[in-house]
Amino acid sequence: MDLVEKLKNDVKEIEDWIIQIRRKIHENPELSYKEYSTSKLVAETLRKLGIEVEEGVGLPTAVVGKIRGNKPGKTVALRADMDALPVEETSDVEFKSKVKGVMHACGHDTHVAMLLGGAYLLVKNKDLISGEIRLIFQPAEEDGGLGGAKPMIEAGVMNGVDYVFGIHISSSYPSGVFATRKGPIMATPDAFKIVVHGKGGHGSAPHETIDPIFISLQIANAIYGITARQIDPVQPFVISITTIHSGTKDNIIPDDAEMQGTIRSLDENVRSKAKDYMRRIVSSICGIYGATCEVKFMEDVYPITVNNPEVTDEVMKILSSISTVVETEPVLGAEDFSRFLQKAPGMYFFLGTRNEKKGCIYPNHSSKFCVDEDVLKLGALAHALLAIKFSNK
Amino acid sequence: MDLVEKLKNDVKEIEDWIIQIRRKIHENPELSYKEYSTSKLVAETLRKLGIEVEEGVGLPTAVVGKIRGNKPGKTVALRADMDALPVEETSDVEFKSKVKGVMHACGHDTHVAMLLGGAYLLVKNKDLISGEIRLIFQPAEEDGGLGGAKPMIEAGVMNGVDYVFGIHISSSYPSGVFATRKGPIMATPDAFKIVVHGKGGHGSAPHETIDPIFISLQIANAIYGITARQIDPVQPFVISITTIHSGTKDNIIPDDAEMQGTIRSLDENVRSKAKDYMRRIVSSICGIYGATCEVKFMEDVYPITVNNPEVTDEVMKILSSISTVVETEPVLGAEDFSRFLQKAPGMYFFLGTRNEKKGCIYPNHSSKFCVDEDVLKLGALAHALLAIKFSNK
Amino acid sequence: MDLVEKLKNDVKEIEDWIIQIRRKIHENPELSYKEYSTSKLVAETLRKLGIEVEEGVGLPTAVVGKIRGNKPGKTVALRADMDALPVEETSDVEFKSKVKGVMHACGHDTHVAMLLGGAYLLVKNKDLISGEIRLIFQPAEEDGGLGGAKPMIEAGVMNGVDYVFGIHISSSYPSGVFATRKGPIMATPDAFKIVVHGKGGHGSAPHETIDPIFISLQIANAIYGITARQIDPVQPFVISITTIHSGTKDNIIPDDAEMQGTIRSLDENVRSKAKDYMRRIVSSICGIYGATCEVKFMEDVYPITVNNPEVTDEVMKILSSISTVVETEPVLGAEDFSRFLQKAPGMYFFLGTRNEKKGCIYPNHSSKFCVDEDVLKLGALAHALLAIKFSNK
Amino acid sequence: MDLVEKLKNDVKEIEDWIIQIRRKIHENPELSYKEYSTSKLVAETLRKLGIEVEEGVGLPTAVVGKIRGNKPGKTVALRADMDALPVEETSDVEFKSKVKGVMHACGHDTHVAMLLGGAYLLVKNKDLISGEIRLIFQPAEEDGGLGGAKPMIEAGVMNGVDYVFGIHISSSYPSGVFATRKGPIMATPDAFKIVVHGKGGHGSAPHETIDPIFISLQIANAIYGITARQIDPVQPFVISITTIHSGTKDNIIPDDAEMQGTIRSLDENVRSKAKDYMRRIVSSICGIYGATCEVKFMEDVYPITVNNPEVTDEVMKILSSISTVVETEPVLGAEDFSRFLQKAPGMYFFLGTRNEKKGCIYPNHSSKFCVDEDVLKLGALAHALLAIKFSNK
């Protein structure tokens, strides 16, 4: 029996076990950095499988499991993120979140369950492994600021890793379909803050003021011009001004106006070109009117998630042995799996869960987000298959 | 001795008395509708002058004094507003405000003192009066919403009034200079609120949202086009967008965006044309993108302050007997003295207090606003002179 | 019989004569600098009245008549412009223009006829004149560039003039009503040209170009912001972008874009503030994108037309003896009578010709513009009356 | 010897012959629909090679050659376009264009030479062909309006064709590199014209006009918002406003304003969404101000060029046997080879000619565009190889 057949049979035995783990985590969602019970469940489950476990790797709730093969080989890391979102669950699944205002609305509960399933398969087929399989259970992917990957990497989680793989469940693709692409697959999220310092005054006498709202209008228009005119239109790219706040009263022109937003790009040149234009636009337009300004970009944001082309070609062939694999467009969301890919070649890929019949049609982050649990076994299978294949390269 | 000489002499006697009243009020500023101690001081002072006093006219802190001439004649109303502003005084006068965060930054303390000075002169020259002089001490001019004039009028303060006059101290004109104009002199302040209801979503996928901030940009640009293209450029007119609020997080496009501001005009046709355009702009631009919207104009705002042309011609001649009188440009601030002028012909005029030597250079509403007290006697004199002249018409 | 009664009777005798002169000129309209037959008619008519005539004063078609009083007195200049407009007349008067594409659409034919009528009255009442009455028949007011006034002034036409008056017929006011105002009455027309030099390229690859049209959009939006935010909203002021030209083909982004327009203001500070902002806006916004630019303002344009306040007060009283006189809003059109007013105190005023019953309802410069000829005698009368009164001051 | 080796040897023999043909055509460039001498040269050359020739296929200058295999098989079409551009050549090659203002600035001369080279190879290896190889020499690709492909198709050129291939030389890729991609590779060029009909008037009185330039500003801003906010930012997409014309004089607001430009997209849904928004934007914004408008999209423009995914996979493997093959980003230029791909599966691909050492660095359509002639044999080889492989499928 070939490897795929073997693993397919094995995963059938534990399908329900995987689902139950997922539901338990779904009922007890925990926000970024507070994944205490989830990480405890992971550590216990790994230990029950006889896997070497290290807790608190870089972060209190970070867990790493290690399965060593009987012969030398490559070190393959498999990653699952664990945190939930500040969303009030409105879907009516029986295992609905029991925590007010917190929900696994992005499927990280399924990621943990699928990787524990993969761990089970790997332990059961330990003889097929070479080198080391490193199971990374990462907190705080949704944090969007520092993020959980960075501290784990600083704590050495990627030392000696030859390949790294990560799966994300997504309602953008049909149930059971794997979707990925070579090169950049997810964007870097350059959060920005623009503050215009004008000089307030009476609403009836704008000429005696430096009107920060009017200036912000000109800046915002020019910023949207960056997308429409300055960036290569073939490049996936977007700037969104997502907050604007200024003023208190209808007859008082305020002193200051503040805008925040995000620049999403998949290319470092495009990224720096956009930021340069933004700085020039803000300072030049403020200069016209004698206003002063601040333009701040959040530092050390998640990098661009770049799939290694050769690895991706190979993985797509491997995965096509267990399901349909499609080449997807890039996504302008962001993922700190990108930091792992900066340390070792690997691939980040989506596992589709969209199933009209089962009502699994809502986008990730929606309060009605729901998952076709039939796909979970495929995730576990993919983890195990890649671990075995690449550890033996 | 002619009337002017007589009154000039009389006012010299009480100049210091007027100044002390002003300083007492300045030290104890009271916000709109809470002018308790100021109105008590007014009522007591009027009674000491033997003047018939009515308190609580339309508002608890409103005070009206009546001086009746010995022979029939016209009823002339003289008005002074009493409220202070939510401003922290930073000027270093010895009689600085003793109330944290409250200051007579618009000179209403001087208005009360000057009208009490005028009352003194009228009592002293009672024989020269015909008909009735009605002294209106009005709360809450700065309120900007309902305002104190309206309830006083509804309580009958303007019943039977033939002429009405009001003075406002202003650092826009040189000390002692009277400034006014025929026809519209101050604007109506149409406060507006625009709410754009879009559909929020992820900052990286604007195409899946109805972006209320982007829509508000287009609306704001078109609104400023009303001033630049749709309103007669000879007409004093301004629209100011003074607040804009939308969004909470750099990567989330919000559902809604809210803007507030003010339309200032001196002409009813211009006013309704501007409001029509604003409604059309907001609904049309929202319509392009499938957003819904609300456009609200505050109701029953202060009317346009319109000086009666004939009365103004006559008053300018009278005042030129006691000081320099200039014809001023209209001002796009607002005043609820306009409501009194809707009930009887009259005139609203400024008394200059700008004096570089004395450091009286800061604009009204400034935390450093200060008054050249030498002009106060002129205000009292003007009140008395107009009362006598017009009561005898 | 007083002066006004005398002149009223005299002008009745020549009313028809004035109307016939007007109609003759109306049938033979001549464009700026080409008023050959009109100026010939003027010279002949003056000579027939025994008036001393000088032709070619500064311009070939300029004519000056001089009537000297018997006793010393003031020199009073009265001015009428003579040129027509490049407009195809579509009104159906029997004395319609006989010249294709040229029409007296702004009433300069009536100005000539009224001043010749005034000359007749002055000759007839020569004894009432002191000093000298100087009749200025000026070419090329409509030229908008150099204009006819400047060369005539350089040729000495205003040497020794004490007062100068000019009438303009206008359908903005009711028939027979005089309208004027103290101070600035007409604007200075700062014509501007903005050229943005970008770098063209393919319409599908804007990022490889410096798109002059996009840049011009930002500039134009900011320019309209000058009106809405930077200039005192009480000041009559307008900027109009009246031409924009760029590009030849739908798939080629051009190199350059050119805009023209006009700034109209009644105040030198406002004027220079607007021009400064325009320069800063164009250079700053071009600077953002690496474009270069030119901002040119036409030189030596017609100045602001400023009526002398004292003279205006006096003239309004004089004119009220022959008709209704109203104080008008300023007009943002331009007039090179302004150059005469820079040389001597005087007044420029409108004579209304709007008459619904007679169908005289079209605005000046309209191809259907028509005049209520009953008012022409009033214009002649006004010229004579002012000449007599001010020459005797 | 395998097929590739055989063809490589054969093409060496005729490399110079191919280059000479190219240079002859380069010296005698002919604009769209006027490729008389080029098509004569093609017909003669084909006949000399013993190939069945048909001239005037749908267009006078269109030429089709047919090479029939000895055994049944597939019909494979190979296409080369023939027209030059209205560009004055400024490159200093010895075989520079001899026709003023006309130049082969896009390499269509090389396309003809490479396809004639391919024809030579196919005739020489006729025994390896099955079915039919149809050589399409197409006029007027650069025309951008109707284009040459459409009439040839209507004349039956694609009847019975099983596969179709087209090569385009491009300085965007290194010399000798083949570049292509599955799915959409070039855009559909929706040329648009927007006319705003307002109501002109005097530059000083915009409120009496419906200002078409101001309205066009609002429209243009909103149009660029389509790119920035309404279209999926991952989608290659651009709108360029490339011409704007309005107005004649600095003091006259014109009646009308006209804009032209192009929408480039690779997806029919995106394309129709953009056009819908454009219509809504123009009509809604015109509606605000009472202007009327026209929005016209050029009809029957070149479709999206869509490479058949399966054929592309196969071709990329075949071509990798003779040179480097890279997967390229889509290009937002347009090509009427797209019409051939609507009739039969096939692939359009680029052949790189960028060679710094040889100074071949200028973009297509540049007056300095020049080609590294060493690559021409590769193009001939590719034509022959694909014809043989796919005719035998």
Curated annotation (Swiss-Prot), chains A, B, C, D:
GO molecular-function terms, A-Z: carboxypeptidase activity; hydrolase activity; metal ion binding; metallopeptidase activity
CDD domains: M20_Acy1_YhaA-like (cd08021)
EC number: 3.4.17.-
Residues the record marks as active site: Y302, E373
Protein's name in the database: Thermostable carboxypeptidase 2
Cofactor: Zn(2+)
Keywords attached to this entry: Carboxypeptidase, Hydrolase, Metal-binding, Metalloprotease, Protease, Zinc
Function text: Can release basic, acidic, aromatic, and, to a lesser extent, aliphatic amino acids.
Assembly, per entry: Homotetramer.
Source species, domain of life: Archaea
Pfam families hit by this protein: M20_dimer, Peptidase_M20
Binding site for Zn(2+): H104, D109, H245
Family statement: Belongs to the peptidase M20 family.
GO biological process, one term: proteolysis
Annotated organism of origin: Saccharolobus solfataricus (strain ATCC 35092 / DSM 1617 / JCM 11322 / P2)
UniProt xrefs under SUPFAM superfamilies: Bacterial exopeptidase dimerisation domain (SSF55031), Zn-dependent exopeptidases (SSF53187)
Gene name for this UniProt entry: cpsA2
Enzyme class: hydrolase
Protein's UniProt keywords contain Protease: yes
PANTHER family, sorted: METALLOPEPTIDASE, PUTATIVE (AFU_ORTHOLOGUE AFUA_6G09600)-RELATED (PTHR11014:SF63), PEPTIDASE M20 FAMILY MEMBER (PTHR11014)
